[in-house]
Amino acid sequence: MNFYTENNGATTLENRKLLASRAFNVSSHYDSAIFNYFNQVFEEPVLKISEQNGNVLRYGENPHQKGFFYGDFDKMFTKVHGKELSYNNLLDVDAAVNLMNEFKGDNPTFAILKHNNACGLATRNTMKEAYLDALAGDPTSAFGGVLIANGKIDVATANEINQLFCEVVIAPSYDQEAIDILEEKKNRIILIQNEVELPQTTVRTCLNGVLVQDKDNVTDTKEHLKTVTTAVPTAEEIEDLLFASKICKHTKSNTIVFAKNKQLCASGTGQTSRVDALRQAIEKATSFEFDLTGAVMASDAFFPFPDCVEIANKAGITAVIQPGGSIKDE
């Protein structure tokens, strides 16, 4: 408002254009909110996105790119400590939250993500045990990662986390002493995840437009499973298959996931062939000394040929979960 006082209430054309722009921003946002409310019922094929809260990021995916975040971050998280989140931090946080949402209400579960993919995940009786077994999944990739828990982070867990360099820690709650420990690293970002509903629609740019779809909220359960082999999976194998399937759902395709005793043993991610993803997973499991005997395998798509199952069998895999659909399934 300084230009009013500085000019005795007079305005320039540029001043009025700026104020008009801000006024129409408010009114158009209000109109969009009304339309989107009614369109929940009528589902007209019209997209109206209006976000008032825009934040300038340090840069985009790379330093030479501009970056912005439009949304109400403070509604989803309470930031306790640390530096400003970067464009890449936000992508990892988004991936972490969506993955851990699959384990909401489960026993203590901890995940470590890097470049939007889980490199470690485990469910245990305590959060400390879950963290340590998640870290064991790939301690190399965990460096600089994003950590997330489905329950309170206590002092014992915080002491273990504090030995690792990580960018972000996310949990629904913390012991105060645990926060004090984690704050010892001045740049580490500590977030409390608030109890809010996650978006139910995904949007991404494509060519000169956007693609919109309903969020994939389907999680495999025992009722979804259909055994198509003579051998029937044990109760323990079924638990591991469902566990691996949740991770597989949130990993870049082509992907193969190995799990055993509710621990991510290894994964092959983002490969151009399913065989390559499988070989990568076997190599990683071997490098971190996992015994795959009795482990299970999840695939994010069907197997067009029997080679993956044959290779997995030789590696010790005893049960496989995959969506099916290959013409060679029979």
Residue spans of the language-model regions?
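Internal, active-site/partner-interface "lid" segment
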Residues: 1-40
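ATP-dependent carboxylate/acyl-activation modules
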Residues: 29-32, 36-330
